[in-house]
Amino acid sequence: MDALIKPLRAGKPDAKPADPKGTEFRPAELDPAEFLAAAVKPDQPRPSRGEAEQAVKTLLAYIGEDTAREGLLDTPRRVVEAYDELFQGYHQCPAEVLNRTFGETAGYDDFVLIRDMSFTSHCEHHVMPFYGKAHIAYTPVERVVGLSKLARLVDIFAHRLQTQEHLTAQIAAAVDEVLKPRGVAVMIEAEHTCMSVRGIAKQGAVTFTSRFTGMFRDNPAEQARFMSMIRGGR
């Protein structure tokens, strides 16, 4: 099931219809600036670390905690340090990860698939973790990218506040834009703690999203082969 990505900004028109020649790969509603560059600019105004720690202290007081007790004295600092790690993707550039490619393909003309890349991200609605596996396939034209680069790409986008649909679309769009392959297939399966530990509390529920471009979008047989290779051997 191809994830239906709605316009991500208010007032933006719906995505353009697919080009019949299969040349319009990138979802029209995604601005390249949001998936090719670091999300935070070096000169972008930001709260100070002290202000961030004070915000954590305020939240602790809001839930009724005594922020002066021994066990919580260093909690604001620890939380801010954890945020630096969990959301480091805002300071990383996805395009740079994919820019180094190799031309020694010996005429290889089938798709390349990396499956079961584990990741943890945080939903933008409740800032709670969701985690699972990402599967990426692409069919190179002349050059291929190092296998670890696709895993790093997943990590960059996962280390930002996300929805699973947006994460899926960003990964596919970045691979399409930088590598210019014949097609890209991305599938993500994840469990969301905002659904499993709060609200309806349905533990074990898994959400699937996918995005197909180019030869994958236009050829259901290639989609089926991609899916069967993901499931093979499990």
Curated annotation (Swiss-Prot):
Could you list this entry's UniProt keywords, alphabetically sorted: GTP-binding, Hydrolase, Metal-binding, Nucleotide-binding, One-carbon metabolism, Zinc
Keyword Heme listed: no
**Any one GO biological process:** tetrahydrobiopterin biosynthetic process
Region (Disordered) residue spans: 1-26
Indicate which residues the UniProt annotation says bind Zn(2+).
Answer: C123, H126, C194
Q: Show the GO MF annotations.
A: GTP binding; GTP cyclohydrolase I activity; zinc ion binding
Q: Which GO terms describe its cellular component?
A: cytoplasm
Q: What is this protein called?
A: GTP cyclohydrolase 1
Q: Which organism is it from?
A: Rhodopseudomonas palustris (strain BisB18)
Encoding gene per record? folE
